[in-house]
């Protein structure tokens, strides 16, 4: 764990999670300024964690922990081959004879959870991997600041959005009347959501058509729990259910999936199943118990799994925060989780089952979480929208010509792309030129630094020249 963070440094200020890390190099600095200390799992001293040092005109930041390896391990977990260890306080009995994503999580029940408000059961309230990423980003930004240089950053979302929200619905039991009831609620709220449909049964054709006409997403809810015909944890059964839903809903393709009861086995095989069928987004990593609510897989940012050979598997994972406010946990949990996501510029993914929409206070809970997210400036996107945007965003390239000149290119057209440019404190007259023309920019503060924000459209295969 990283502890005793120096709050006066932009690198280590503002971090609230336990900063649980795995692996790295132990050292005790004999020169420089320690910004954080390292302790082992028993909270015994293990050396310095972060040290900055100046030597002549040079500047270094030493990070003892393997931050990238820690992020990957927390996100992907260990292979799920047996039940995980339950929470000692009884809040998460994950030893339920059902193999699921939580059985592979690696965080600590004691040190990595905190209550949303005092006197409530602890949950994974703070996104640890988000903050480990921020440490890396802020260390790099600090190096640029020390050298009085700017650098461009391709922001996470279009139109200057700082974070977004997503709502999914698992169609368990496929009750048509309850489905209409939930659709009516989200339609009145003017948000688009993702419907994960479970085999067998489904809904009437008119319902699927309404979802398509109103720009909702139809996704798969892979059932490997009931162990009836075609509902076992096999690639063949996954393929069968995938094809069934395409025919059932009358759609050409499926882009997203969430596993029923967050079922999971082994480590990466399911991502390969998804990739083979063209599923580009999965939503299965998340809590099935009260004590694992929040960020048991570390973060609010979507991520691509890394295969054992080091290559990316092209299936974006969007972690789920909680299921069914009111049914699973009090309504105010939703606001607390949104606050955590907002602080880290991530995605707040909530699951509401149609099966619960007519139960007392559930409808009001949906309304409350939607309206509160809007107050934080979040838009509600479908899983498919998030996946499509991330695919587009990752094709954009920034090429450094020299310290104040850059080119931006993309093989496809992408609209309303957000870029932010670091403004070091030593620069008093900051300006941005695009293709030789001065443009207006918006001052913003992110990661404890000052930035200039611009929003531009990028045409396919056209070079945009940027000069600062």
Model-derived regions, located:
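Beta-strand-turn-beta hairpins that frame and shape the catalytic cleft
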Residues: 52-61, 160, 309-316
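Extracellular ligand-binding/catalytic regions of CAZymes and related secreted enzymes
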Residues: 55-59, 65-159, 360-397
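Surface-exposed beta-strand/loop patches in extracellular or lumenal glycoproteins
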Residues: 410-428
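C-terminal beta-strand-rich structural cap/linker in extracellular carbohydrate-active enzymes
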Residues: 445-468
